[in-house]
Amino acid sequence: MSLKLSLVSLSNTDLPIETKQQALIDIVLRFLTPQERASLFESITHQRETNLLARYPEYQSKSLSVLFELMDYRDLVRLDPNNLHDDVYLLELTVAECFPHWLDFWCACEIEAIKQKYSLENREPATELSFEDASYSAMLIDDISKSSMRVQLPSYPVAMTLSDAVALSNLELFVQGEKWYEILPLLSLSQKGKHFILLQTQTTPVLVASALIQDWNQRNTWLSYAPQFNSEKWRFCLPLHGYQELNRLDILASDLVTDYGSLTVFDQAFQTHITKTEMVCEVLRLTVSGSVQHKLYFLYLAQKELMNVLFQSGYKVGFTIIEQAFMLNFYQSIDSKAYFHSGYCDINGDGINTYRGFWNFESMVDTFKRTDFRDYKRRIRVIRQNTQVNEHA
């Protein structure tokens, strides 16, 4: 049966929505190669983004999650038929009947494509995740696509490649959970390159946290320097002690001055001044897995181990982008030299600021030497009594 006939057959059935969703995913995975899927998903996404911005130009700078929820996707598909062949139009019509929108379907397909490589018939014995720091080990992997390590996830207890495990955890947390659809066309960054990983050590280690580490020579793919995070919409807020720390760390040819009028101008100056580029990186996609309580613990432990691993590897400063309230609240409670903001922006106009900032790895290591999980939670509880993040921290 062809793709078109399979879609017609599915459209004519009266199945429960969850069954129909799974059947549609299976059809796409069966008839399209990974390369064909990638091309199709990106083409339709680009066309629908263009259609939506033509209707709502005031949403030009909003995230894809906001943009794709502006109107009923079924109406969008009918009002603006895609300009590809009939099979694709029928596919999109069927997607619109089964999923909230195209990006939700894309994410579901990527998750299922990974899971179908590994049968749950080969599931690992049930694992109880510990709250003891000594049960975990942390390391930096130069290129996870070349690693022979096999790990499992709390959400999917089957031995799989490290690159698939990292990609699956990123999809489940950031895309499926937090609707960060911008990751989808850049999913390959979760499948290769340098990553920090945190494992519960056992016969088949359990991957409980990971983060993408990009060196200075990869800054063309840094999110910090992408247009959405490096525009005039961003409020520049680097504090005086931030300048002092960056100048003190011996990574610059000459001191930064304190009169940069915008984040964009500061970024340009930093790139001009930096000489010891091997000591600077960007850290993104800090992912944790498990139950709600375990995620909070792994967020604590992952930060603690991440700072130590990167500092021991010769890094002094890390660029990062944070919206996570627990992390921001904790940073307000510690030495202001350990983490400081460089800019912030309410990207979606929903009252939630996203922050760009710097980790000073040596100071962060010192902070976590004095902070156990109980103290971490206590600090967060105290800071949560305040209603705002201090953008000058």
From Swiss-Prot:
Reactions the enzyme catalyzes: a fatty acyl-[ACP] + S-adenosyl-L-methionine = an N-acyl-L-homoserine lactone + S-methyl-5'-thioadenosine + holo-[ACP] + H(+)
InterPro entries hit by this protein: AHL_synthase
GO MF annotation list: N-acyl homoserine lactone synthase activity
E.C. number: 2.3.1.184
Keywords: Autoinducer synthesis, Quorum sensing, S-adenosyl-L-methionine, Transferase
Signal peptide: none
Family label: Belongs to the LuxM / VanM family.
Protein name: Acyl-homoserine-lactone synthase OpaM
Biological process per Gene Ontology, one example term: quorum sensing
